[in-house]
Amino acid sequence: MRAAFERFGLLINDRIVRTPVGIASMAGIVDADYVLERAGHIGIAFIGGYSIDRPTMTAAKTLAAGGDRKEFLYDDPVKELKTQIAKMETSDVVLGINLRGSSPDSFSALARALGNTVVYEIDAHCRQPAMVEAGCGEYYLNHTDRLVAVVRALKETGVTVSVKFRIGVAPDDRTLAVALWKAGADILHIDLMDAGSAKLRQIRNSCPLLIIANNSITNFDRMREMLSHGADLVSIARQSDERTLAGLDAAITRFADEEGWYNSPKQLCRGGDIRALCFCCMPVKECPLIPTLERIGLPREDYIRMKLESVRGTPLEHGNQTCFGSLAWCCKISSPCMFRNMTLKQYGISTKEYMRLKRDLSETIMSRVFP
């Protein structure tokens, strides 16, 4: 697992995530047994959705009785979830439980009963009328004060919190992301529908939370598109067969081992997200850097100072012969530059190590932009 951490640098719930490929919940289908059959190709899995109080358990029975959907049915959600969690104890897959509840107290009571060994995912995604009428799923996206209250209630119990939601339902997804971040959420699990990478980039530029991109990400090109626009992981639900998962796992592992930064953003001038500031030069000409700094409220002088301070004492401090005297201002390795490459060769810095150092710089930048 140490090799996985060096490769991807992913920690969730204080556990190393082996690969940025995950399984998303599907009611009545994704349980511990489903996950264990695919465990060799994933780093995280969200089982569920599990209804956890009387209104949502009644809604689940209504949906199951309709015959069109599978649901997990039980009389005691705590007992059921303890059984599922116990099955996963020896697995290195980070476990999340996708939960349908109608009140903050329902979530916090469950967290106190189960403890902090799992990620608690609030289901703000389900759009089935019975669930929405019960006060969960997409209900929360139109009543964000209630969703924020659930996040806060869970965080008061000391657990890791994810929120699963569908893009384009809330009045403003960026405002929602900021509200969830401020409330204490740790993860945004986003069903992008047909919104594409531009919407993902907007959310990445709104908050520092770990982002899992979901929906039809079944090939490496699609996966890279999501990762290069702000996602930290991707998840699959209906198409989470072993072959698809294995293919994504192998491809991203190979890419990371070759490139050094598995989810490196596109450069800012090519549509990259805010992390791409690590590739930007001095703010001396009219380009996308200037409006980006203005939008995030970062004066040019502070931007210059921040980058220089961040690379002090690191190999990125070198580069007298580069355009601006330091590798801090140099572009992505995929962009040709003989001055950058001369510096890398002079100081024995591999292209892979260069990209890892740029990843470290981007993390510092994100922590400064989103304190």
Q: What is each model feature region?
A:
Residues 1-103, 323-370:
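N-terminal capping/small domains of soluble enzymes
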Residues 3-5, 56-59, 78-85, 104-106, ...:
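Active-site-adjacent beta->alpha loops and helix N-cap segments on the catalytic face
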Residues 15-23, 90-97, 155-166, 204-216:
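Short beta-strand/loop segments at the ligand-binding rim of alpha/beta enzyme cores
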Residues 31-39, 104-116, 170-182, 207, ...:
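Catalytic cores of alpha/beta
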Residues 38, 56-68, 132, 200-206, ...:
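C-terminal helical cap(s) of enzyme catalytic domains, especially alpha/beta-barrels
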Residues 45-55, 119-130, 186-197, 229-251:
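Glycine-rich phosphate-binding active-site loops on the catalytic face of alpha/beta enzymes
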Residues 72-76, 98, 120-125, 137-146, ...:
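Catalytic beta/alpha-barrel core
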Residues 196-279:
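Catalytic alpha/beta core domains of metabolic enzymes, predominantly
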